Design a protein with these regions (language model features):
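Helix-turn-helix
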Residues: 18-21, 29-63, 67
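Short, basic, alpha-helical segments at the C-terminal edge of helix-turn-helix-like DNA-binding modules
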Residues: 70-75
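Residues in soluble alpha-helical coiled-coils and helical-bundle/repeat scaffolds
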Residues: 59-63, 67, 85-88, 121, ...
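Amphipathic alpha-helical packing segments from all-alpha helical-bundle domains
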Residues: 77-78, 82, 103-114, 124-150, ...
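Hydrophobic alpha-helical connector segments
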Residues: 67, 78-110, 154-166, 190
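Hydrophobic/aromatic-rich alpha-helical bundle segments in the mid-to-C-terminal region
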Residues: 127-131, 148-200, 204-209
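N-terminal intrinsically disordered/low-complexity leader segments
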Residues: 1-17, 179, 204-209
Length: 209
């Protein structure tokens, strides 16, 4: 007989649900109103909880923002995995991987996060809170990339450098697109990044064989 799934205690389930509402409300507020308009009172209003409930889970606004960003990063990595898993064997996997990453990088939710990171330049407390999240996110991205491209050996430092270049280039281009949209330049940039990824992956496969 199969074991029955054990449900979390009601209080624990309610706490998780409250945190989920707060994090989603925080991200939505960042997208719609920017950092200046993302106040704890507005987040609570959207989430349908009291400020007391918010501060029970997150000691301050910076902690809330960092948690919201980390939760968003996790969902975006999951989206990327699902998207690349749907690529057929007949398709160009490297090209699809680069273009899918660009689609995610230009989502309004992630562009709002870039704005938040920029604000950390003049806010040491916010910068420290986001720094830890960013480090974990980069580690998760690297792990996901290696799973999606198993031909890469474990000690392929050039692959890690390529991944960093691709992500950094896309982040910069995504920020620039907020002010000046240039689809032709975007297309050329994606072709260059695809060529770089293809070369590095090809060399990594040779080293592993």
């Amino acid at each position: 007989m199969a074991a029955l799934a054990v449900s979390p205690p009601p209080q624990q389930a309610r706490s998780r649900a409250t945190r989920r509402r707060l994090l989603r409300a925080c991200v939505a507020c960042l997208v719609e109103r920017g950092l200046a308009g993302t106040t704890t009172s507005e987040v609570c209003r959207r989430a349908g909880v009291s400020q007391g409930a918010l501060f029970k889970h997150y000691p301050n606004k910076d902690a809330l923002l960092a948690a919201a960003v980390e939760d968003l990063f996790a969902s975006l990595v999951a989206d990327y995995r699902r998207g690349l898993a749907s690529v057929s064997e007949s398709e160009d996997r490297v090209r699809a991987a680069v273009r899918l990453l660009w689609q995610i990088m230009t989502r309004p939710t992630l562009q709002a996060v870039f704005e938040l990171m920029g604000a950390g330049r003049c806010d040491p407390a916010l910068r420290r809170a986001l720094e830890a999240v960013q480090i974990r996110h980069r580690e998760n991205l690297s792990a996901a990339a290696r799973e999606l491209f198993p031909q890469v050996p474990g000690d392929a430092s050039e692959f890690d450098a390529m991944l960093d270049v691709v992500i950094s280039a896309m982040q910069g281009a995504s920020l620039g697109a907020l002010v000046l949209s240039d689809p032709a330049s975007d297309a050329r940039r994606l072709e260059a990044l695809t060529a770089l990824a293809r070369r590095v992956l090809g060399e990594a496969a040779k080293k592993k064989s």
